[in-house]
From Swiss-Prot:
Name of the protein in question: Cylicin-1
Predominant place of localization: cytoplasm
Regions of compositional bias (Acidic residues) in chain numbering: 454-463
Protein's gene: Cylc1
Compositional bias of kind Low complexity: 388-404, 513-523
Location of region: 8 X approximate tandem repeats: 527-543
Pfam families the UniProt entry points to: Cylicin_N
Biased composition (Polar residues): 191-203
Entry keyword annotation includes Lipoprotein: no
Matching InterPro entries: CYLC, Cylicin_N
Biased composition (Basic and acidic residues): 298-316, 353-364, 428-440, 465-488
One annotated GO biological process: single fertilization
Length: 642
């Protein structure tokens, strides 16, 4: 063994002995951990320094498809933002600074920069959020807002748009103040108006004056000077320089910037919206409060005219009333005629249907009663219509004109009633004929044949009672009855032919079933089939179809019941009780038919053993042929090697 191996073995033994001590273990672990941490920190610092000093230029053609590298993960987001800010040009710095001033958020700037990721939970984040919310309700913030409002009101010129209402038209006092840019630029306090109609216009005069200046295009009234990345609020003096204004109002500028400038921008927009609303309100208020011209004078003049020319007005009114009464009479008469015709037509159609239904049911008395009721009801309706016509007429008309009008109307009504009755009768007859045909088609199989001779007699008796109007109805009904008789006779003949065909079919089926059964079963079960045949014939005569076919299975079951010819039907033959001596024997009561007999099993073949394979000796086998190769070329040294 070499010396190096011996030294290594000694060292390992000493390490094992000393490793058990606690002091040695602590020293080793602490020093090793510190060494690793120092190396890691130095490597990270070197990497960050290298990235900051020598940034990689991105290639135009290539795109990064891989995930973030270790350097990007190591560098925090706050450091990246600082690097981006340092690399921005000056004009970007200026624009960003102005944007931050005028569009300042409710949260502070350091809170936004130092906030961690949104999706990570951090107790510091919640703590800072709570502090920022508390700062809104702070008293210091309220005091700053109050001071800022006071300074804005001092810087704005008051236009004093005093308005008065005379005869519903608003007028603006002080023509010199219509164009405030030309007037003297002196600061005036807002004045309150004493008029009752201008109560809502007193609300926030400072807001109103500011909006008036912006609307009329007075850019000099509120000059926002942007210099040194700061916003300043100047007076309306156009001759003053921006530098002087900045120097004079430096204290005001600092306070304006510290307070929320976002509130100012929002309020400017609110002022514009409120100003338009005030204009609309003022116009509406002026229109509503304006005195309207009274209409009593016109009425009085009319009354005086009526009093002066009373005779003329009386004549005109009398003529107008006469015309109106004549028009009303005509309208009432036409409406009465139409309503009477429609009612009579409906009543006739209903009564016609009722009469036809009653005739089918063979009720003579009810038919005559309904005809009488129809005549009485028609008389009542005619009386009512004549009564209405008589009330429509006035005392001014003569008696002769009444009688002539009534005669003409009655003639017209008679013509209209006849036309309506004929139409209703034709419609009802067509509908009922269709329904009757459907019912007859359904009732051919179920309903028995009925005689309809009585209906013809009933229709004739009712025709005499009702008169000439009902003669047409009776003729139509008689024709319908004749058609129904013909149809029912044909239906009855068809049903009888169907029953005869069905009887023939049942007889043929029974004969076939007898021929199919064997001769043995026929001799024993002949009585039962004869009985069934007589039953089926009796049932066919009553109108019902009964088909009973007998198979071989039924014949075999009847053989067991009718064992001996001397035994009566209904009694079973008692089967013999088996004993231990007759265990192998079995009592055979009936004979099995030839169709049910089982074929005998084929004879069993003798068992044959499988043939043994014949083994041949290998010595006697012919040797396997040797492999043949292609002839080698004629080279001597190859032959020598082989």
């Amino acid at each position: 063994m070499s010396l190096s191996k011996l030294d290594s073995e000694k060292l390992t033994i000493e390490d094992v002995q000393t490793s058990s001590s606690s002091c040695r273990r602590e020293i080793n672990t602490t020093t090793y951990d510190d060494y690793i941490l120092s190396i890691q920190t130095s490597e990270k610092q070197n990497q960050e320094h290298f990235v900051l000093t020598f940034p990689k230029t991105p290639m135009p053609d290539k795109k990064k498809r891989s995930g973030p590298s270790e350097l990007e993960v190591a560098v925090p987001i706050q450091v990246k933002r600082k690097i981006e800010k340092d690399q921005k040009p000056t004009h970007v710095w200026i624009n960003q600074f102005l944007r931050d001033i005028f569009l300042k958020s409710s949260f502070s700037r350091p809170f936004i920069t130092q906030a961690p990721f949104k999706y990570l939970y951090n107790p510091q984040n919640h703590y800072t959020m709570a502090e920022s919310r508390k700062s809104k309700n702070d008293e210091r913030r309220k005091t700053l807002k109050i001071k800022f409002r006071g300074k804005i009101s001092s810087c704005v010129v008051n236009l004093e748009p005093m308005r008065t209402i005379t005869n519903g038209e608003p007028e603006i006092l002080g023509n010199t103040e219509k164009n405030p840019s030309k007037s003297s630029h002196k600061i005036k306090l807002p004045k309150t108006s004493n008029s009752t109609s201008e109560t809502n216009l007193e609300y926030n005069n400072s807001k109103k004056t500011l909006e008036m200046s912006l609307r009329n295009g007075n850019k000099n009234s509120m000059n926002f000077v942007l210099k040194g990345n700061a916003a300043t609020c100047c007076k309306d003096n156009p001759n003053t320089d921006s530098k002087k204004s900045v120097e004079e109002f430096s204290d005001d500028i600092s306070e304006c910037i510290n307070s929320s400038n976002m509130d100012l921008m929002l309020r400017l927009n609110e002022f514009r919206a409120e100003f338009t609303d005030l204009d609309v309100w003022s116009t509406n208020c002026s229109q509503n409060n304006a005195k309207k011209p009274l209409k009593t004078g016109g009425k009085k003049e009319r009354d005086s005219d009526i009093d002066s020319g009373g005779s003329k007005d009386a004549k005109k009114e009398g003529k107008k009333k006469g015309k109106r009464e004549s028009r009303k009479k005509r309208n009432t008469e036409s409406s009465d005629a139409e309503s009477g015709d429609s009612k009579d037509g409906k009543k006739k159609s209903k009564h016609d249907k009722k009469n036809e239904i009653k005739k089918k049911k063979d009720t003579d008395s009810t038919g005559s009663g309904s005809g009488a009721s129809m005549v009485s009801k028609k008389g009542k309706t005619e009386k009512k219509s004549t009564g209405k016509k008589s009330t429509g007429s006035t005392g001014s008309e003569s008696v002769d004109s009444k009688s002539t009008n009534k005669v003409k109307k009655q003639v017209k009504k008679g013509v209209m009633k006849k036309a309506v009755s004929t139409d209703s009768e034709s419609d009802a007859s067509s509908k009922k004929s269709k329904k009757d045909e459907k019912k007859e088609n359904k009732g051919r199989k179920k309903k028995p044949i009925k005689d309809t001779e009585s209906t013809d007699a009933d229709s004739e008796s009712e025709g005499d009672s009702t008169g000439k109007k009902n003669e047409k109805k009776d003729k139509k009904i008689t024709k319908k009855g004749e058609k129904k008789d013909a149809k029912k006779n044909t239906a009855s003949s068809e049903s009888e032919s169907d029953l005869g065909v069905n009887k023939k079919k049942t007889k043929i089926k029974e004969i076939v079933s007898f021929s199919d059964s064997t001769s043995d079963s026929y001799s024993k079960a002949g009585r039962r089939k004869n009985v069934r045949r007589s039953d089926s014939e009796s049932e066919d005569s009553s109108g019902f179809r009964v088909l009973k076919s007998t198979d071989d299975s039924e014949a075999s079951s009847t053989d067991s019941k009718t064992g001996m010819p001397g035994m009566r039907r209904g009694f079973r033959s008692l089967s013999k009780k088996t004993t231990f001596n007759e265990r192998g024997k079995r009592s055979v009561t009936g004979r099995i038919p030839s169709s049910r007999e089982r074929l005998p099993f084929p004879p069993c073949e003798p068992f044959r053993a499988s043939p043994k394979p014949v083994h041949v000796c290998k010595c006697k086998e012919s040797p396997s042929p040797k492999a043949r190769y292609a002839p080698l070329p004629g080279v001597e040294w190859i032959h020598k090697l082989l």
